[in-house]
């Protein structure tokens, strides 16, 4: 067989999922039933600057991806010969321009890049803005590739002139793996198309002022139906066999949700929240049942299930708030010559949550310099405590911060215009704390459930490959084996706390609406002082 993939599926018992995130690039091996075998990772690298730029080297990203696959091969005996398929997903939004010879036209603009903010304001004021939102289901922000290309067209026409195709992160890796320029239905439709058809929409492209740039948009392929073979060059770079089928996954946010249980049989009322640096709150919906809010915020992202999408609202900062309040304690202790390791701080979380007084304070978790993006968009929004007294102590502050994360999640789910979750499936590092899960469940008013799945994004990508290769007849059959058995027991929220938080939520909502003029005035007062441009909202 040499360095070519053969057709003996009896020995090809593994699927490999790649998740190229903003923080880490991972390659994960799974057996065909979904059991995780091994994982390899390298830190992702990008640069930021005071003008709001956040950029990443395309060549370095491919080098790092190939390195994770070689490292995975060092951990798994016979990985190359055993790999039945490779699947790739990655960070969403952003712009990865490729020119002649499939070489980078420049560094990638990430979802973090804020330079298109003024262009977004102009597009939002256009007469076709609402029609664009109703087609894509997605609020326009500086993170979106469409906004970034519109900004480039106005300010950097030479860059676009060098480009032959505009890709996303996973698409760039797929190009390097297969030599095929393509994107997936999820990012194509929420950026330039219609989530109902999963195709490009010329009216949307025209509303964005990008008809002249239509040439940059690649072919759309559905990775549950189409794969391409690993190229000889990619085989040399990764240590895998040329000809191995490669699957282009959907964007990592919905594949993470898929692996964590957003869509399982008999659980139509369940929702999924990813509690990471940001908060992603979503419900799997039939396309005809999606509700588009009057504010024009959020995302509607196609799922790799026919006729289904994830209706998404995302708040800018989730565990960033917890990091901030933990750092308050750490910094104070340093003044007295005491240090706390990250692990020691994490061990304190449950104790502080238990000793803090429930509902004694209100906290709005807008700790990011970029303000808030969901369920409302305001770059001037800032965090605050309401209700401080001389009796307030650090555990009260800490508990209020976690309650604030729950309030933000409830705010997001309320704004979707659909029934509140009857079960909340949680993923993200912070949800390992049972006490924290208890607070989130009580604030949202739903039982919580977590999965033992460690690498949900890579698993979601591998699941797409499993369906594409016929290991399973459809995604529902794959979910039944890869996802459902890994879900833990439902944890019911405390009834008394649920009632308390239900009474407090209207005050939380009214307070954040009343604070808008204060945020604006504060921003004006600070304008004369040097502050780096805040980073833009987007999918990470």
Describe the role of every protein-language-model region.
Residues 38-42, 218, 489:
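Structural signal for short hydrophobic segments within the conserved structured cores
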Residues 209-221:
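A conserved helix-loop-beta module that forms one wall/lid of the active-site cleft
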Residues 76-111, 139-143, 174-194, 219-224:
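Short beta-strand-loop/turn "lid" adjacent to the catalytic site in phosphate-handling enzymes
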Residues 2-6, 16-17, 124-136, 147-182, ...:
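Active-site core segments that coordinate phosphate-bearing ligands/cofactors
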Residues 43-45, 111, 211:
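A generic structural motif
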Residues 1-107, 235-236, 240-248, 444-448, ...:
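N-terminal glycine/serine-rich phosphate-binding loop of ATP-dependent small-molecule kinases
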Residues 34, 57, 86, 113, ...:
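Residue-level signal for inorganic ion chemistry
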